Curated annotation (Swiss-Prot):
UniProt name for this protein: Putative acyl-CoA dehydrogenase AidB
Organism annotation: Escherichia coli (strain K12)
Residues where FAD binds: 182-191, 216-218, 423-433
Record keywords: Cytoplasm, DNA-binding, FAD, Flavoprotein, Oxidoreductase, Stress response
Induction line: Regulated by Ada in response to alkylating agents. Also induced by anaerobiosis or by acetate at pH 6.5, via RpoS. Represses its own synthesis during normal cell growth.
PROSITE patterns in UniProt: ACYL_COA_DH_1, ACYL_COA_DH_2
UniProt xrefs under Pfam families: Acyl-CoA_dh_1 (PF00441), Acyl-CoA_dh_M (PF02770), AidB_N (PF18158)
């Protein structure tokens, strides 16, 4: 018997086979403006590949098939390994092929390589975010290791700089590509790493014996981890490889994988060091200094990753609104919905402008002024963007309605993924305290801000008023106001970039919406049209 109760209609088809790069006008402009226009053709190519149904399916598969801890083999021998779904390995292979883990560190890296790498990172993050964890840690650790690789591991340089992903369980020197992890957090300390109890004792050959634990040990399958441990000289940073120079496994015991809210594809582990061997990087007592050198880059990636997921959520929402009809018209033509989507697009415009200005600062960090710019605005961007992500994705869910709340949609996974970047590499308060530390202790920071804001002074009254408000707060920056100061600093950083590079009507609209404390701003029809055109590559208007 043939059953047919109804015909399915007015249900949008899934967003597959789109170009993640060319559909994002703000990103395309920022890449060229900030010095990586030479990578545009390649970005368009990988944007097309990553936007396919096949790539998006890999992201889904990697999350519904989380990693599995293998502590013992069938005979009871320790394995201390992690098994991943094949989709994970394909995602990692694509990331390494596209050099998201080391583009800026190649010997012949071009000017703007940090900017190009940021764009590549952002495109991959829209497909699957968990696989970016090993990539960002490897990216941050590589420049330090290129300077400080211990003598027994000098043959690691070539695989560190390769474009290969190698998941084989082998010593690093025998592999075609390497991953580096970090181990800092302990049960009692969290962000307070000075309270770490893991001890390191120097041995006769110059290596150290480590005894202790780590509570969150990301990517336990990495070829080595940079680990904080206490020495006679204070908290220090150690290179702790998975395999020792003689080919034996190091004494790193994998105890349990974390059962996390999101980030399901990525393995986060509890580990114990039972006389593990490590090699000191730098001097005893320099652990915090070395970790902070890497922490700035991983914090930047947190902000970039959250922004990318916001961009993906917005793309799903506007694509749905373009196809779905209500009351006889496309949802995107309904005045209130069009205004909501336009404001979401405007928010992404400002974030894109600031993030890629930050990427340029990281690219030119040899210049003291650029390094200071990155030092100040990186924690500010991480604080604000990572916090914005959750309500932003929830707003995108509302555009789709009930179907956006179902697991068949990408949005539940994006929503669960969002909180991790607010926590990883320092939660919100840590970011705000870091901003205050820069404002209170870094010479030249007020001159830097003055120069950035004076450059666009007089172009918008809301911006000028917000600058004066921040100046008053900075006369005596109280710790209790750290969040407000950080948020205001971030907004002014975005506003300065918008006033400098966006069209005057769009820049002024951004300043009024984001900086007018009275609220109730209505975007003009022309601004809405421009925003939605730029946000979709001219498709959904």
């Amino acid at each position: 018997m043939h059953w047919q109760t109804h015909t399915v209609f007015n249900q949008p088809i899934p967003l597959n086979n789109s170009n993640l790069y060319l559909s994002d006008g703000a990103l395309c402009e920022a890449v060229t403006r900030e010095g990586a226009g030479w990578d545009s053709d390649f970005l368009a190519s990988i944007g097309q590949q990553l936007g396919t149904a096949e790539s998006l399916e890999l992201g889904r598969l990697a999350n519904v098939n989380p990693p599995e801890l293998l502590r013992y083999d069938a005979q009871g021998r320790r394995l201390d390994d992690v098994r991943f779904h094949p989709a994970w390995h394909l995602l990692m292979q694509a990331l390494c092929t596209n050099r998201v883990h080391n583009l800026a560190w190649e010997e012949d890296a071009r000017s703007g390589a940090f900017v190009a790498r940021a764009a590549r990172f952002m495109l991959h993050a829209q497909v699957e975010a968990g696989s970016l964890c090993p990539i960002t840690m490897t990216f941050a650790a590589t420049p330090l290791l290129l300077q400080m690789l211990p003598a027994p591991f000098q043959d690691w340089t070539t695989p560190l700089l390769s474009d290969r992903y190698d998941s084989h369980l082998l010593p690093g020197g025998q592999k075609r590509g390497l991953l580096i992890g970090m181990g800092m957090t302990e049960k009692q300390g969290g962000s307070d790493v000075m309270s770490n109890t893991t001890r390191a004792e120097r041995l006769e050959d110059g290596s150290y014996r480590l005894v202790g634990h780590k509570w969150f040990f990301s990517v336990p399958q990495s070829d080595a981890h940079l680990v904080l441990a206490q020495t006679a000289g204070g908290l220090s940073c150690f290179f702790v490889p998975r395999f020792l120079p003689d080919g034996q496994r190091n004494a790193i015991r994998l105890e349990r994988l974390k059962d996390k809210l999101g980030n399901r594809s990525n393995a986060s582990c509890e580990v114990e060091f039972q006389d593990a061997i490590g090699w000191l990087l730098g001097l005893e007592g320099e652990g915090i200094r070395l970790i902070l050198k890497m922490g700035g880059m991983t914090r930047f990636d947190c902000a970039l990753g959250s922004h990318a997921m916001m961009r993906r959520a917005f793309s799903l929402a506007i694509y749905h609104a373009h196809q779905r009809h209500v009351f006889g018209n496309p949802l995107i033509q309904q005045p209130l919905m069009r205004h909501v989507l336009s404001r979401m697009a405007l928010q992404l415009e400002g974030q894109t402008a600031l993030l890629f200005r930050l990427a340029r600062a990281w690219d030119r960090r040899a210049d003291a002024k650029e390094a200071l710019w990155a030092r100040l605005f990186t924690p500010a961007a991480k604080f604000v963007i990572c916090k914005r992500g959750m309500p932003f994705v929830a707003e995108a869910m509302e555009v789709l309605g009930g179907i956006g709340y179902c697991e068949e949609s990408e949005l539940p996974r994006l929503y669960r993924e969002m909180p991790v970047n607010s926590i990883w590499e320092g939660s919100g308060n840590i970011m705000c305290l870091d901003v205050l530390r820069v404002l209170n202790k870094q010479a030249g920071v007020y001159d830097l801000l003055s120069e950035a804001f004076v450059e666009v002074k007089g172009q918008d009254r809301y911006f000028d008023r917000a600058v004066r408000r921040l100046q008053q707060q900075l006369r005596k920056p109280a710790e209790e106001l750290g969040r407000e100061i950080t948020h205001q600093l971030f907004l002014l950083g975005c506003g300065a970039q918008m006033l400098k590079y966006a069209s005057p009507p769009m820049a002024q609209a951004w300043c009024q919406v984001m900086l007018d404390t009275r609220g109730g701003v209505r975007l003009s029809e022309q601004i809405q049209n421009d925003l939605l055109l730029r946000a979709t590559g001219g498709v959904c208007v």
